[in-house]
């Protein structure tokens, strides 16, 4: 016989007059004039239990209850007295009059109150089991479950087959460092945990499983950020005989359906933007369209100005000069203060910028002025070093109005894109940005397409793949892979939502000769290609179908949906930013015997510093 009849949080006024049996944890116990009230909690929420002293044995047990005791309650559902209804709870119109009370397991005093919102992350992760009892975490993980179920339902309805691929595979160069697993049987050889199932899912297409998916763990040994984990969950999908447009349409429908069924959110239109346009307008390949600020291209304007910071960047190979107009940023009342501007100047240095030039637009009507006083309606130390034609062009291109502030970025294009792109987001999300309608609180999805096939690595002096080396070039671009790799555009695509890359993919190369051209462009020799990817090259020769796919980061999707500050808030047992599990103390030393069996001898290990 089941130990309970209902979940605590699902007991409502539809059960009035019925006897229920509940199991859960004591959230709070209150003694009011001889009557004890106990809030009992489970994954679905709370219900109030009333313990009356008329039942002496039961009441004695209730007197001994403390927070986090695991208990069983049997009692009668009745309406709460007038004036005590709690509209914020599903169970807020009723209470349970306790008839029987059993302590299933007492609890020691918890190291913190579960309703404490100011806990450090170290405390939360060290005591993760208790942290997971908090409604915030329970709601996050329940949403994660529902999203995964909706994804499975959609894919199943569209003919996709869930197929597992190996966790122990071959180490291949895919960008990040592999997590290696030593082989006991094959001395000196290692498996690698998968960074993605990329090659196996392509092999499944060759094998004839034309619609594949799995929700799987992937592993990357890389430096961690707020949106990264060494192990993460991927919704991995591949399909044959669909065009790039077909693939994007199908999985746009999937994400739209998931948001509607789980959050009742209509995502609306997904604008499609080329990579080059995204970088030109926002300095990012995952722009946050909620922020109503855009770059203004000024490189061509600044080639002959006396201000060397601008002219140097404008004339250097790979340099860029942009403006970022902040409407209302120079107003005397409600504009950005000198302290805020100085803080932004320090902020962009994080991204390699040397400083942050600006012009305050006070009164355009005063015009360019004269030699004695140039541009009297503008306020900036750089105006004197920029000729009138350039200043007029800056004002025209940016659409500047009285009270506006124009920030400038001038350096190598990557530094400008990173620094001014980050500044755009920071200002947009600031209180100033929200008060001045520079930020729109909404869901803004989009597709970014037409990525370059390759980018040049200055340090290694060779081209690297922007997505991965199995991405197909656009039709007509194959020959450029050899003659002009920098011109070659791929059939890659990313789905972006509110500045986060939710998922990305591409049409794949399905011909061995084209795949070899990519390896040639990447300076991967035929011998290395055969050693690393011979199994794929061989498979492509057996009538491989046209195919493509994508992968969504489940952790990121849930982070976006919940508004969590960290991806660690949507994973049951995450790692810290130092790739440690504070709950289990992993990684940890292992027994010398285990190392000998694996043919491993350690250098003297350094102790792990505390997180």
Swiss-Prot record:
Gene Ontology molecular function: aspartate-tRNA ligase activity; aspartate-tRNA(Asn) ligase activity; ATP binding; nucleic acid binding
Source domain of life: Bacteria
Pfam families given in the database record: GAD, tRNA-synt_2, tRNA_anti-codon
EC number, as in UniProt: 6.1.1.23
Signal peptide residues on this chain, from the entry's feature table: none
GO biological process: aspartyl-tRNA aminoacylation
Binding annotation for ATP: 220-222, 229, 501, 553-556
Residue positions binding L-aspartate: 174, 220, 467, 508
Family, as annotated: Belongs to the class-II aminoacyl-tRNA synthetase family. Type 1 subfamily.
Job of this protein: Aspartyl-tRNA synthetase with relaxed tRNA specificity since it is able to aspartylate not only its cognate tRNA(Asp) but also tRNA(Asn). Reaction proceeds in two steps: L-aspartate is first activated by ATP to form Asp-AMP and then transferred to the acceptor end of tRNA(Asp/Asn).
Record note on quaternary structure: Homodimer.
NCBIfam families with a match to the protein in the record: aspS_bact, PRK00476.1
Protein name as annotated: Aspartate--tRNA(Asp/Asn) ligase
Species whose genome carries this gene: Albidiferax ferrireducens (strain ATCC BAA-621 / DSM 15236 / T118)
